[in-house]
A protein has these predicted regions:
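Acidic, metal-coordinating helix/loop segments flanking the phosphotransfer/catalytic sites
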Residues: 7-25, 35
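Short amphipathic alpha-helix used as the core "switch/output" element in two-component signaling
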Residues: 38-50
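Recognition helix of helix-turn-helix DNA-binding domains
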Residues: 118-151
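The C-terminal output helix
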Residues: 90-102, 163
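The short loop immediately C-terminal to the conserved phospho-acceptor aspartate in CheY-like receiver
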Residues: 30-31
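C-terminal output helix
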Residues: 61-67, 77-89, 125
Length: 166
C-alpha cells in the first residue's frame, strides 16, 4: 500500500487531485476556509464514489454530526482524539473493500438499482439487454455478499453511495 498525502484549498484543486491520484480514503479538516467538508464530500461522491470520507473536526454539534453521516461521511474524528484515526480509516476501508472489486458497469447498475430503477429502465438507460443488467446485478450481489435488493440498498446507504434519510 502506498501512502500519499496532499493538501488542497479549492474545489478545483480537490477535483484535480481526486482524478490524478485516485485516493483510497479522504480526510477533510473542517477548518478549511475555501472548501468546506460537505462541498468536498459532494465532489468526492461525483468523482470517486467508493472512496471513504472522514471528517476531522473540533467540536461538532449534534446536527453537524447527523448531517455529515447522512451526506455519506464514514466518520467524524475529534482533533482531541486523533488516536482513533488509524482504526477509523481501517474500518472504513474494510467496509468498502468489496465495493472496489466492482467493475465500472457493475457500479453503474448498483447505483441505478438502489435509486429505484426497474431492470428494464436500467437496460434502456445503459443501452444493454435486460439479461445483461440481471447478470451485472447478480455479480454485484455476489461480490457484496447480499441476497436481495433490500440488503443491497442497506449496503449502499452504509457505504455512502446514497444518503440515509433515517
Amino acid at each position: 500500500m502506498t501512502t500519499m498525502m496532499g493538501r488542497v484549498n479549492s474545489a478545483e484543486s480537490f477535483t484535480v487531485a481526486l482524478r490524478s491520484f485516485a485516493p483510497d480514503v479522504v480526510l477533510s479538516d473542517t477548518t478549511l476556509a475555501q472548501l468546506d467538508s460537505f462541498a468536498a464530500l459532494e465532489i468526492l461522491r461525483a468523482v470517486r464514489p467508493t472512496a471513504p470520507f472522514i471528517i476531522v473536526t473540533g467540536a461538532p454539534t449534534g446536527a453537524q454530526t447527523v448531517a455529515a453521516i447522512r451526506a455519506g461521511a464514514e466518520n467524524l474524528i475529534l482533533r482531541a482524539y486523533l488516536s482513533g484515526l488509524v482504526s477509523s480509516i481501517s474500518d472504513a476501508l474494510a467496509i468498502r473493500r468489496p465495493l472496489h472489486s466492482l467493475t465500472e458497469r457493475q457500479l453503474q447498475v448498483l447505483k441505478l438499482v438502489v435509486e429505484g430503477y426497474r431492470t428494464r429502465d436500467i437496460a434502456d438507460r445503459l443501452g444493454v439487454s435486460v439479461k445483461t443488467v440481471e447478470s451485472h446485478r447478480g455479480q454485484v450481489m455476489k461480490r457484496l455478499r447480499v441476497h436481495d435488493v433490500v440488503h443491497l440498498v442497506r449496503y449502499a446507504i452504509r457505504v455512502g453511495l446514497i444518503p440515509s434519510t433515517f
